Amino acid sequence: MRVFIDKLKDKQDLSFAESKNAFEILMNGKASDDEIFDFLTLLSSKGESSDEIAGGVFVLRDKSKRVNVDDCIDTCGTGGDGMNTLNISTASALLLSSMGIKVAKHGNKAVSSKCGSGDVLEALNIKIDLEPKDIEEQIKKNNFGFMFAPNYHSAMRFVGPTRKKIGKRTIFNMIGPLSSPALVDRQVIGVFDKKLLKIFANALNNLDIKFAWIVNSEDGLDEISPYSKTNVVQLKDGKISEMLIDPIKLNIGANKFENLLGDDAKFNANKMLDIFKGEDNDFSKAVCLNAAAGLIVSEKYTIFIDAYNEARTHILSGKTYNDLKEIQNV
């Protein structure tokens, strides 16, 4: 482990192979607490590279319990934007599943916010502690399955205490959203910092992803924002490109940021139920913007505004609420 730590001390990036080797040592419980501490803090102070992130993802995926499903999408973001918004990507995942898109959602309970995806799904009476075969069945039947990260990544136990001791963001906050136990090859990923857009795209390019959108909005969300421009980096078939989504030009008509602020799991779940029943508000529009990205990445649409309009028509019909009841009954 020391050879990698010494390289990081010299502010040198690790290669993909070196990163894989280092994370193998970490995830096999062969590194001391001091080595884990040095490795994670030095990576953070240097700035994590795409090869370092990809190496970590490769190992974490390899050691996770496996969910065997085909052609699914995930909408798992990094979190950590500090905005305490409603659960936009979780709501967009449920909307997409109601629209016929197979979603293997990977997530956790709250870390920096009041309510993570696991918390809000529990508040909606959706089971989050399912085994792989149950999730496979649920996706087959209802187009939606949730993989609760701690149940699937037992190797994380070796680094958990040191991450707590460090007490701030580490490379694991970036590795987690990319480490789906379902090995999805289509993703919409929100990131907490604009500078991660291309880093994530290059990391995913090492990992056999067919189509991904990595997003960060100019008002600081790790989502597509209904209020301000969102920077998007697209990875499709090995090619990386950039674009901008402007809600003013798209005539989204959202009013004020306060309308997206969340609270505890019960509050957030009730807001989600309201929009699934067809209530039209800023939260509904934000969810449809992010679902539109999912429709693009699933290759059901090629034009963003068309995908958005289809998501709007669907959510306002109330059908999402009826489909949610099927997921709750599992």
UniProtKB/Swiss-Prot annotation:
Homodimer. The keyword Metal-binding applies. 5-phospho-alpha-D-ribose 1-diphosphate binds at residues 77, 80-81, 85, 87-90, 105-113, 117. The keyword Metal-binding applies. Anthranilate 1 binds at G77, N108. This is Anthranilate phosphoribosyltransferase. Keywords: Amino-acid biosynthesis, Aromatic amino acid biosynthesis, Glycosyltransferase, Magnesium, Metal-binding, Transferase, Tryptophan biosynthesis. InterPro entries: Anthranilate_Pribosyl_Tfrase, Glycosyl_Trfase_fam3, Glycosyl_Trfase_fam3_N_dom, Glycosyl_Trfase_fam3_N_dom_sf, Nuc_phospho_transferase. HAMAP family: TrpD (MF_00211). Mg(2+) 2 binds at D222, E223. Its cofactor is Mg(2+). GO terms for cellular component: cytosol. Anthranilate 2 binds at R163. GO terms for biological process: L-tryptophan biosynthetic process. Coiled coil: none annotated. Binds 2 magnesium ions per monomer. Catalyzes the transfer of the phosphoribosyl group of 5-phosphorylribose-1-pyrophosphate (PRPP) to anthranilate to yield N-(5'-phosphoribosyl)-anthranilate (PRA). Its EC number is 2.4.2.18. It comes from Pelagibacter ubique (strain HTCC1062). Pathway: Amino-acid biosynthesis; L-tryptophan biosynthesis; L-tryptophan from chorismate: step 2/5.
